[in-house]
Curated annotation (Swiss-Prot):
GO terms for biological process: rRNA processing. It comes from Caldivirga maquilingensis (strain ATCC 700844 / DSM 13496 / JCM 10307 / IC-167). The keyword Hydrolase applies. It comes from the Archaea. GO terms for molecular function: mRNA 3'-UTR AU-rich region binding; RNA endonuclease activity, producing 5'-phosphomonoesters. Its EC number is 3.1.26.-. Probable RNase involved in rRNA stability through maturation and/or degradation of precursor rRNAs. Binds to RNA in loop regions with AU-rich sequences. This is Probable ribonuclease FAU-1.
Length: 471
């Protein structure tokens, strides 16, 4: 049976999904053990699910490739058709690459990675490399550095430990075992993974012996390897870009285990101290007012922020913080923030120069599938508007978050409408999100001028005088 370790803000909901689909939960936290009444297992996981450190609100799945795909399918069956990204090659895979120009190596047809130490090799050379980074810019090392359940081979003759290994006795034992055999790795070293903290000294020695044998076996394969042959599979990675609807599903699943407000997981994306959330959910258990208390907590979060972060997440995982911006208004789900723009360049989609004193007012309705940026000059003249189409806007503890859906509309100062990046819709890796973007675009494009004018009127009523020309 596949063994899964679950960590992060979605742990309770994901543990329930994994258990329902027959996976074994290993290395669970005390909270998860208590909530699900399961036995503690220290076995190493085949797959780990955790928060993605680079993409706010996303899941990061890593482990044995065949098992990662199964776990991904289990999650998608519950949360629906969401965007996810898989690197072209596994992490720590060992591949017979072909050295290319400009410091790169081709590790699969058309797939280039930066080659560490590229000055020592010539274009056309065949070279076994280990993929040491597969998210963002691919990077390959000319050292043979496979990974196992308990350790990873590294490119310097040292013994290192995962930061998750806390026990002093375990640390001393693992260092001792590592140093006793490190000379058998031919100039390489090891980094013990967190699962190694549960090993006895005898089992740690066996784990290291197996890693040494693995390195030697890979070296034997090199002589007969062809271009792009994978000499060691490594670990597959998937980043799952969760949007509001997926998070709401996970809120509901968690609510079957412990009282959970709607919006729980969005709030926790940037929440460091969960005491107020815990107390609110205690009240949910007592008063059964789940939706009302969830809205109240979201209102509390936004009402108490003087600056707002706008987490603009793209379907490829790129994260852009459009803040922090000054909160100038929040009431009944309507949030308005102000950002001063740096002079230089042009306003997105409008081809209008950004000048000294320009500002952007972002008009954000929580739960809506778009938000509008109103651009004004130093004297309050309307310079244009940019309407971003996105997934429903959610409240985080430090602002708001949404997934950008590529296509947008602009309205210039003469109230002429332009659709931009419509051709990028097909690049979204989710049919559901494409359909939602097309529906929102269709709904907006006939009414976007009225939408922008209404927003300008709203800003004027708040004392933010904005003037424009035109009918």
């Amino acid at each position: 049976m596949t063994k899964v370790r679950v960590r992060g803000i979605y742990a309770t909901a994901l543990t329930k999904i994994m258990l329902e689909d027959g996976y074994d939960i290993v290395q669970a936290t005390d909270t998860i053990l208590s909530r699900f009444n399961i036995l503690h297992s220290t076995e190493p996981p085949d797959v780990t699910i955790k928060d993605d450190e680079n993409i706010p609100g996303a899941l990061f799945i890593i482990g044995k490739c065949s098992e990662v795909n199964k776990v991904l399918e289990s999650i998608l069956r519950r949360v629906g058709d969401v965007a996810y990204n898989k690197p072209p090659v596994p992490l720590y895979s060992v591949i017979m690459g072909v050295v290319a120009d400009n410091g790169h190596i081709e590790v699969a047809p058309g797939v280039l990675a930066l080659l560490e130490g590229s000055n020592y090799f010539r274009p056309g050379d065949k070279l076994p490399v280990t993929m040491v980074n597969v998210t963002g810019q691919l990077r390959a090392s000319p050292y043979i550095m496979p990974t196992t359940s308990y350790l990873r081979v590294i490119d310097s003759p040292t013994v290192r430990l995962s930061r998750h290994i806390k026990d002093p006795d375990a640390k001393m034992m693992l260092v001792r075992v590592g140093l006793s055999k490190i000379n058998q790795l031919g100039g390489l070293g090891i980094r013990w993974r967190s699962s190694a903290q549960y090993l006895s000294e005898e089992d740690a020695e066996k784990a290291l012996d197996e890693a040494i044998s693995l390195v030697n076996a890979i070296r034997v394969k090199i002589a007969e390897a062809r271009d792009y042959d994978m000499l060691f599979e490594g670990e597959c990675i998937v980043s799952v870009i969760l949007d509001a609807e997926a998070r709401w599903v996970l809120d509901d699943i968690r609510n079957t285990i412990v009282p959970t407000v709607k919006g729980h997981h969005a709030l926790k994306i940037t929440m460091k101290n969960t005491e107020i959330l815990d107390y609110t959910e205690y009240l949910v258990g007592e008063l059964k007012m789940r939706d009302e208390l969830g809205r109240a907590l979201a209102n509390y979060a936004l009402s108490n922020l003087s600056t707002i972060n706008v987490h603009h997440v793209k379907v490829n995982g790129e994260h852009i913080n459009l803040g922090p911006g000054e909160r100038v208004h929040y009431s009944n789900g309507l949030l308005i923030i102000r950002r001063e723009l740096k002079p230089g360049g042009t306003l997105d989609g409008l081809n209008v120069a950004k000048e000294y004193g320009d500002a952007a007012y972002s008009v954000i309705n929580i739960g809506e599938r778009h938000l509008t940026h109103i651009y004004v000059s130093h004297d309050g003249s309307f310079k244009g508007a940019y309407v971003n189409i996105n997934t429903p806007i959610e409240v985080t503890w430090d602002g708001v978050i949404y997934i950008d859906l590529e296509v947008d509309l602009t309205v210039d100062k003469g109230f002429n409408v332009n659709i931009i990046d419509e051709d990028k819709l097909s690049s979204i890796p989710s049919r559901r999100l494409i359909n939602e973007a097309e529906e929102e675009l269709s709904r907006l494009k006939g009414d976007v001028v009225n939408l922008v004018r209404n927003h300008i009127d709203t800003l004027s009523k708040l004392g933010l005088s904005i003037h424009y020309q035109g009918p």
